[in-house]
Amino acid sequence: MNGSDSQGAEDSSQEGGGGWQPEAVLVPLFFALIFLVGAVGNALVLAVLLRGGQAVSTTNLFILNLGVADLCFILCCVPFQATIYTLDDWVFGSLLCKAVHFLIFLTMHASSFTLAAVSLDRYLAIRYPLHSRELRTPRNALAAIGLIWGLALLFSGPYLSYYSQSQLANLTVCHPAWSAPRRRAMDLCTFVFSYLLPVLVLSLTYARTLHYLWRTVDPVAAGSGSQRAKRKVTRMIVIVAVLFCLCWMPHHALILCVWFGRFPLTRATYALRILSHLVSYANSCVNPIVYALVSKHFRKGFRKICAGLLRRAPRRASGRVCILAPGNHSGGMLEPESTDLTQVSEAAGPLVPAPALPNCTTLSRTLDPAC
């Protein structure tokens, strides 16, 4: 949890006196829903990608890494954040006080950097489908993932000393141990490197991708099928970009207001803090939902896993049926190498199918200094 948010929560709880606080019940329920949907959904994403060694393309490796970061974020952040609204004391000890916040920021940065890498991968795949093949290899993707986690460790390392357990009045709390100027500088760095810069990269790459898709005209396959494919890719890009920006913008705007503006500690601002937490945390659980809605290959993978689980169930549970769509169900990847979106090759030669913008890419999350 961010230092300013921590103080705000303490002050707000003191305002409530000893009366019943609705957030003590409602907020943990929302967190429980986010936890269940996020844990199950992201675990399912990993299962679909790992089933039969399907994560072999660069995009699938990035999506796999994003799922790992999202799942770790859900497991390491949500349960502890929920206890803030139900327990007066920090009951998990000094070691977890430091470790939990370190893991939170580690997964935040890993998620945001992965999203930026996915956007670059998609831009190269769409804009330079032939020339980027030598660059977009699984080996290079694994190297990029290693770099992502290395940078995440670098930027999250200071949080091992940022928080500490201490006594406040008669309460045991886990709160920032740094001075206000150091916290302000650290929170500003977190905003810049884990939100602002990734958003700029996402905006630039997706804008250029959209521009290329919108302006490129296929003289042969310019019929309704090509237009439908173009609209589908455009819609997917807009969805993932808007989700990321909308889910995290309120939280970071609030943090900036706390440090650089006027943000009085009232019940209304406390409610805004809670809302910003819920919206930002929800981004990690809606990603698998977006995958399922947009990617038919993910849906096929989900059905295949569902069918496999039901086959292992006792026969007396035969009333629970997992219906498979007709056709070939062998596809388990979130992104196949083939696509119905046809592009003009870079050399004004014959038309070649271009790697598709992934039907499974979405923008997570990434970062929450208020955790």
Curated annotation (Swiss-Prot):
The chain crosses the membrane at residues 28-48, 60-80, 99-120, 141-161, 187-207, 237-257, 260-280. Glycans are attached at residue 2. Residues 1-27, 81-98, 162-186, 258-259 are extracellular. Pfam families: 7tm_1. PROSITE patterns: G_PROTEIN_RECEP_F1_1, G_PROTEIN_RECEP_F1_2. Residues 49-59, 121-140, 208-236, 281-371 are cytoplasmic. The keyword Transmembrane helix applies. It is a multi-pass membrane protein. The keyword Transmembrane applies. SUPFAM superfamilies: Family A G protein-coupled receptor-like (SSF81321). One of its GO terms (molecular function) is peptide hormone binding. Disulfide bonds join 97-174. Receptor for the hormone galanin, GALP and spexin-1. The activity of this receptor is mediated by G proteins that activate the phospholipase C/protein kinase C pathway (via G(q)) and that inhibit adenylyl cyclase (via G(i)). This is Galanin receptor type 2. It comes from Mus musculus.
